[in-house]
């Protein structure tokens, strides 16, 4: 193989997602997931050139064993030799990183410094970087960090500050950071292409809807606000996260209900959202499939879409210019026609009129405009964060 490929690593605390992409064509050569780290059933599954495989990693296996298995067992010699750089998804870069960077000792320290804002993710990313250095020592200078928070660093102060004592921001960095930046960036850029608008002129509201969900207001190609905040807990209703709520509810849960801080955190992060509202599941497909026959399903989806529509409406105001499109992406955004329909029905005041046939067709990888002709545009665009990571890595390494 003469082409230069990029290995993409997305390390979680107990898992490792990986892929190998051609950054020019976008062709995916390998994808996979290693999971259940530190447990008796640690395992790995992958798809190489269209063929699937899986294996046990051994009890207690983690990032090191997974990466060693990838290098020694999954990769062919040709594929291994074609890897020219490694791209690392990093959840939090704090205020320091506004774009992707080649990983140096200084960058590693920066990721460590931001770990207090992402205590589950950033330490895992650092493990992934360390293991990548060991597995591919000849590529040490070709490792690149792509930050989830970077795209949102163009937010103005009035958008990222909380109305708390200013010292909390100055001394401790308490502010809005946002997440899903790579996805919001990708679909805003793709919207510009599809609508034949320059990337630095596009005005869109991007809705990344999945188990985690966020909205971003993008004016002239730059993010000016986003719904996730200091952590991914703020904003929209999500699979298991509450999103926005009155902070005094936390005091009530602690002082009156006797719940510990750990119990409250678990409730807000793991037991709320669609799971909390349905009392059945965090899977949006349940609510969509049972919307007409189960009150719990209807309740959950109505709250989800109402919250989403409120954010979209408020972002229309702050963009302050002609809005080119509302973009739906992510697992729910790309596939849940009913979510898009209910949400856009809330926005009829602004002229949005859904085309039922187009909306129903836009799923399972199909994309396109879902609103009626000669009405404001809403469009479904599948996200591809891996491609952004591959392209940024190639740009900084090749």
Curated annotation (Swiss-Prot):
Subcellular location: Cytoplasm
Pfam families: Acetate_kinase (PF00871)
Keywords (A to Z) from UniProt: ATP-binding, Cytoplasm, Kinase, Magnesium, Metal-binding, Nucleotide-binding, Transferase
Reported cofactor(s): Mg(2+); Mn(2+)
Name of the top EC class for this enzyme: transferase
Sequence positions that bind ATP: 17, 208-212, 283-285, 331-335
Any GO CC annotation of this UniProt entry: cytosol
Binding residues for Mg(2+): 10, 385
InterPro entries given in the database record: Ac/propionate_kinase, Aliphatic_acid_kin_short-chain, Aliphatic_acid_kinase_CS, ATPase_NBD
EC number of this enzyme: 2.7.2.1
Catalyzed reactions per annotation: acetate + ATP = acetyl phosphate + ADP
Positions of substrate binding: 89
GO BP, one annotated term: acetate metabolic process
Note on cofactor: Mg(2+). Can also accept Mn(2+).
Complex formation: Homodimer.
Similarity section: Belongs to the acetokinase family.
Protein name: Acetate kinase
